[in-house]
């Protein structure tokens, strides 16, 4: 995933703000991934267009919508969609081989409640996701930018939290984060505690046990065997 910074200007040409985002990184598709992209994109892919999506039109029903940013190769997202047919899932990933792999797995699993996008997540949120429409926003194992001088590049910042808040359903919507970097977990808690309109739903302390709905990945299982921790965090939109 690559990061870019663009400037936004007003009509007078004065810069209003800097926008940091994460954009599509091209990679080499395998033949299987390319085949899945070609075959499945017409039914499961959503092209970027600066217009708000209508979830009923997208999925053909009014089921709750779960959106994941940065699903990697998509195995856990496909598993979640397969295990919860009563929900609709949409994944945004900038790495095209990951999108192809996800579509291939989804086709093999025979699921119909999953859609994917290959575009900048911030642009999608700003122009395509209706306010107050998401039941859950998932952000699993984002780049930790572990060097201190790079912490400002972490996706979880106050402006990102506010963007998420606007898209979640009031008094219901959940922002679910997971990381295997303790320092990033602490950073997430610090940011979310400052972000207005959110409450941590952990019963004790700041973190929750891994929820059953989040599949245990091979990478995570290996980390457990090596003694590495994983921190799950859930905040609910309250205002």
UniProtKB/Swiss-Prot annotation:
Pfam family, one: Methyltransf_4
Pathway membership, UniProt: tRNA modification; N(7)-methylguanine-tRNA biosynthesis
GO cellular-component term (any): tRNA methyltransferase complex
Catalytic activity: guanosine(46) in tRNA + S-adenosyl-L-methionine = N(7)-methylguanosine(46) in tRNA + S-adenosyl-L-homocysteine
Top-level EC class as recorded in UniProt: transferase
Protein EC: 2.1.1.33
Keywords, sorted A to Z: Methyltransferase, S-adenosyl-L-methionine, Transferase, tRNA processing
List of residues binding substrate: 147, 180, 217-220
Keyword Transferase in annotation: yes
Top-level division of the source organism's lineage: Bacteria
Active site: 143
Function: Catalyzes the formation of N(7)-methylguanine at position 46 (m7G46) in tRNA.
Assigned protein family: Belongs to the class I-like SAM-binding methyltransferase superfamily. TrmB family.
Name of this protein: tRNA (guanine-N(7)-)-methyltransferase
Organism: Vibrio campbellii (strain ATCC BAA-1116)
Name of the encoding gene: trmB
């Amino acid at each position: 995933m690559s990061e870019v910074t663009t400037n936004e200007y007003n009509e007078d040409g004065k810069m209003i703000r800097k926008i940091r985002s994460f954009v599509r990184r091209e990679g080499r598709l395998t033949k299987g991934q390319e085949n899945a992209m070609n075959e499945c994109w017409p039914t499961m892919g959503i092209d970027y267009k600066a217009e708000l999506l209508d979830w009923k039109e997208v999925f053909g029903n009014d089921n709750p919508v779960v959106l994941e940013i940065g699903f990697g190769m998509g195995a856990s997202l496909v598993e979640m969609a397969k295990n919860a047919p009563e929900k609709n899932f949409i994944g945004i990933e900038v790495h095209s081989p990951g999108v192809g792999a996800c579509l291939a797995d989804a086709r093999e699993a025979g699921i119909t409640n999953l859609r994917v996008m290959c575009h900048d997540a911030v642009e999608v949120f700003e122009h395509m996701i209706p306010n107050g429409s998401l039941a859950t926003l998932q952000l699993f194992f984002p780049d930790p930018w572990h060097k201190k001088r790079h912490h400002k590049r972490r996706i979880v910042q106050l402006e990102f939290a506010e963007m998420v808040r606007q898209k979640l359903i009031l008094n219901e919507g959940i922002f679910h984060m997971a990381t295997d970097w303790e320092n990033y977990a602490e950073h997430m808690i610090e940011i979310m505690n400052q972000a207005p309109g959110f409450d941590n739903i952990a019963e004790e302390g700041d973190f929750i046990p891994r929820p059953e709905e989040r599949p245990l990945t091979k990478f995570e299982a290996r980390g457990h065997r090596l003694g590495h921790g994983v921190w799950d965090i859930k905040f609910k939109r309250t205002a």
